[in-house]
Amino acid sequence: MRILVENGRLLDPSRELDVQESLWIEDGIICEKQAFSANQADRVIDAAGGWVVPGLIDLHVHFRDPGLEYKETIETGCLAAAHGGYTTVCPMPNTKPSTDCPEVVKEVLDKASVACGVHVLPVGAVTVGQKGEQPTDVAALKEAGIVAISED
């Protein structure tokens, strides 16, 4: 599929890019230069007045899964994130049970692997059960896949 995004402000801090120009996407891959004309595009998006940016990262989300799924699941949280332009999220450990052991980290990552394509990078708890008493095994949590620790 060929998509042309026109009239947007392209922003990419990693490339020091801040320009008003078109963006061409072919089969899900951004093209470096004009790859096709507007009449060859399957879809044309007018981004006038908007920004076109790389995927956003939310370092502090509350998915509440496992244990409090009636508030938010990993799937619904990922869908909401994707709709908002986020490609990566870091769910806080304040779930039931909290993300304080490798088994819970694995559960979160397993659920995230079948969600909507948003990268989920779990945050581990600082203390067991988030009770502020016994420290978690941060090395084991890191090995399981956490990217940070928090008591939130």
Language-model regions, residue ranges each:
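Conserved residues at the C-terminal ends of beta-strands
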Residues: 11, 92, 152
